[in-house]
């Protein structure tokens, strides 16, 4: 439904979300960024704005970095829909996107951004499920549970083992052939 999609894209950050975004902009790993890409969702732009202002950067908006279209989970008929979307890359809810579809569009956007910005430090602001599905291109899903805790590994090393939180920061390191050689979840100072 187009109206639902537009409403979803216009969701704004909470006051806490704004504070977390400002703290995130001070994260050491996010300094000296050359180029920034975001989805076209308002809350993603709001998360990026502090980094953009501090580093005097312009934003590049690409809707391919948008969150997965959730559709209608229909948990009455499919009570395990949340776990199923991780274990079956082609599963999708009515009107929603599958893991494979999200990964495809995220991968196309990522590869284009990397190709167009060779040798630059790139920050991409996207969304929890979309990023997770994208990371599954290289990571192994070790587990997911009904509490929405995820465990991901890369090259037999656990890189994420908790619930996706907004924002979460993942660093993807590429070699000179643009092959992924490392993935890590960057912890940052938070409100606690």
Feature locations, PLM:
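Short glycine/proline- and charge-enriched loop/turn segments
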Residues: 2-9, 83-86, 151-152
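Active-site-proximal alpha-helix that buttresses catalytic centers in soluble enzyme cores
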Residues: 1-57
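Short catalytic/ligand-binding loop motif for oxyanion handling, primarily in non-cytosolic enzymes
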Residues: 1-2, 44-47, 69-71, 131-134
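Acidic, low-complexity terminal tails and accessory targeting/binding regions
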Residues: 60-61, 67-79, 118, 136-192
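A generic secondary-structure signal
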Residues: 23-27, 108-113
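Phosphate-handling substructures
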Residues: 11-12, 53-108, 160-164
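Beta-strand elements within well-structured catalytic alpha/beta cores of enzymes
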Residues: 37, 117-126, 130
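Glycine-rich phosphate-binding loop signature in dinucleotide/nucleotide-binding domains
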Residues: 29-32, 113-120
């Amino acid at each position: 439904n187009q109206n639902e999609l537009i409403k979803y894209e216009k969701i704004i950050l909470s006051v806490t979300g704004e504070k977390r975004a400002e703290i995130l902009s001070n994260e050491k790993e996010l300094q000296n960024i050359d180029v920034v890409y975001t989805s076209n969702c308002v809350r993603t732009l709001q998360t990026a704005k502090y980094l953009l202002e501090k580093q005097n950067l312009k934003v590049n908006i690409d809707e391919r970095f948008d969150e997965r279209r959730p559709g209608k989970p229909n948990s009455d008929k499919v009570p395990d829909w949340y776990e199923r979307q991780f274990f079956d890359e082609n599963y999708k809810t009515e009107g929603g996107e599958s893991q494979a579809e999200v990964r495809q569009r995220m991968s196309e956007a990522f590869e284009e951004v990397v190709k167009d910005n060779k040798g630059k430090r790139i920050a991409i602001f996207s969304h929890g499920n979309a990023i997770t599905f994208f990371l599954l291109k290289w990571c192994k899903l070790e587990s997911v549970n009904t509490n929405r805790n995820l465990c991901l590994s890369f090259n037999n090393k656990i890189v994420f083992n908790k619930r996706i939180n907004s924002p979460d920061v993942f660093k993807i390191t590429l070699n000179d052939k643009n092959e992924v050689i490392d993935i890590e979840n960057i912890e940052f100072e938070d409100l606690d």
